[in-house]
Amino acid sequence: MTTFIQNPTQQLQLRKLTGRIGAEISGIHLSSELDSSTVQFIHDALLEHKVLFFRGQQHLGDTEQEKFAELFGSPVKHPTVPAADGTDFIFELDSQKGARANSWHTDVTFVDAYPKISILRGLIIPETGGDTTWANTETAYEDLPELLKQFAEQLVAVHSNEYDYGGPKQNVEPEQLERLKKVFVSTKYETEHPVVIVHPETGKKSLLLGHFFKRLVGFSQSDSQLLFNILQEKVTRPENTVRWQWQEGDVVIWDNRSTQHYAVNDYGDQHRVVRRITLAGEVTTGAHGLKGKTTLPKDLSAEQLEKAKLHAVLNAN
């Protein structure tokens, strides 16, 4: 189904890509100069479709990507990885530097107020391969049997940046992976999140899992993994997913509070570079009001704590 939206400056077309997640918007030139009605349309479409795809945005450079992102919230840096050279907030994923995630995850869930929105721009795209798949974590929750919903709502999971990027990867030299991991876990983070969270804007429930997951509070590692596998499998079922074949100049925006994604590492030694900006989110809230809580790092100095508090205030929405 294609929806046409008219405004004084451009005619937008929105086309759903699957029954449960994803829509492509065309007829738009992304920039920081978008009028308020267009920004509102994109925001509302994002809440409904979870992931929005835009072709042909080659004009969008690093600076303009950062300015465009500010229309939807406050950009935040990655907690451990420095911003790309010449930028304030951009997180670069370069396959030649070992950045091949190749796992299902929600961005930066190892902190309590993880990003609400991610905006990804394709710079160098392989001729073949290198797609990204997104999954709808709200419909995954909705598909659970009632008793399993009730059980999941009682669970609390520990998320850590020691996980996900620490796993084995194809087409990545061990030395590259070790360098990447050292940067990624230069400060160790652990955060406890409810497994079922409530979206702060829509009020809908979803499953917060992905491969930053470490264990469930109160369960052994083996039992944690068994329960994780049961719930994670619901997220990644084909009917909950959309797969995007990248072209250079594409921009993808997703609601990081109701999705997981997976960058497919199937492009061998071809070069792939994408650049991401994330927007400040809120501390998670569970189905029964429990809040997310960061438990590590604990060894921050008083000065570091004050800086962290100031950073949180400056980036609050």
UniProtKB/Swiss-Prot annotation:
Molecular function via GO: 2-oxoglutarate-dependent dioxygenase activity; metal ion binding
Alphabetized Gene3D superfamilies for the sequence: Clavaminate synthase-like
Keywords assigned: Dioxygenase, Iron, Metal-binding, Oxidoreductase
The keyword Metal-binding appears for this protein: yes
Enzyme Commission designation: 1.14.11.-
Residues that bind 2-oxoglutarate: 132, 272, 276
Alphabetized Pfam families for the sequence: TauD
Cofactor(s) required for function per UniProt: Fe(2+)
Binding site for Fe cation: 105, 107, 261
Gene Ontology terms: cellular component: cytoplasm
SUPFAM superfamilies for this protein: Clavaminate synthase-like
Entry binding sites for substrate: 78, 108
Enzyme class: oxidoreductase
Source organism superkingdom: Bacteria
Record family assignment: Belongs to the TfdA dioxygenase family.
Its job: Alpha-ketoglutarate-dependent dioxygenase that in vitro catalyzes the oxygenolytic release of sulfite from hexylsulfate.
UniProt subunit comment: Homotetramer.
Name of the protein this chain belongs to: Alkylsulfatase
Organism this protein belongs to: Acinetobacter baylyi (strain ATCC 33305 / BD413 / ADP1)
